[in-house]
């Protein structure tokens, strides 16, 4: 039987600003990536989201990003590997405090936005992030783009790593995500997105934006919890995977 994790970015509200459908989406996923206060969230949101995940039996991971609330962590920043490592450790520590307060263990770490994309192509940056995670807790699992430099960096130091694919994003021929600013970057047709995910899991292939099939290995599928159709899409993808005899389980049960 095929097995896969279904993850979603949660806890992205801030103060009086509400983002996402966290309370609804959490029933359909197996792992939650919780923002840690740099690109989104605040202490109350972090505390609430950890409690929400615990109540739903969903595994918790830190979702560290660049300190850029206005840009939602999606703008590139010129940081040294040393800075990136410290940023990641700082944010893991913040979320881990709320996990400890609730008596649960943090499962994984998934960098956010620009930090995720930059580290996917920059080995030095990827190495710094992986070292930061490993030093804090060598049992944590890195969740990173399949085929990226982050996968290589984690494997080089013995950090557990799960390969992630995106249900609603287009891929370049080199396996990287098509930039959101580029036409065709988002897969908006739900049926197409679901078929792509099933193909990734069962055939280890994905059709790139040029139409060429490229190899891909997948341990976890990312779905998004914001947007008008988010909830219905998450429901459909979970049901479709189950109909294909693909078991949805959290990362720590895969590793």
Swiss-Prot record:
Intrachain S-S bonds: none
GO biological process: carbohydrate metabolic process
Family matches, as InterPro entries: Glyco_hydro/deAcase_b/a-brl (IPR011330), LamB/YcsF/PxpA-like (IPR005501)
Top-rank taxon, per record: Bacteria
TM region(s), chain numbering: none
Pfam families (alphabetical): LamB_YcsF (PF03746)
EC primary class: hydrolase
MF annotations from Gene Ontology: 5-oxoprolinase (ATP-hydrolyzing) activity; ATP binding
Enzyme Commission code: 3.5.2.9
Reactions accelerated catalytically: 5-oxo-L-proline + ATP + 2 H2O = L-glutamate + ADP + phosphate + H(+)
Keyword set, alphabetical order: ATP-binding, Hydrolase, Nucleotide-binding
The keyword ATP-binding is annotated on this UniProt entry: yes
Quaternary structure and interacting proteins, as annotated: Forms a complex composed of PxpA, PxpB and PxpC.
PANTHER family recorded: 5-OXOPROLINASE SUBUNIT A, UNCHARACTERIZED PROTEIN YBGL-RELATED
HAMAP family, sorted: PxpA
Family per record: Belongs to the LamB/PxpA family.
Purpose: Catalyzes the cleavage of 5-oxoproline to form L-glutamate coupled to the hydrolysis of ATP to ADP and inorganic phosphate.
Listed name of the protein: 5-oxoprolinase subunit A
Organism: Clostridium beijerinckii (strain ATCC 51743 / NCIMB 8052)
Name of encoding gene: pxpA
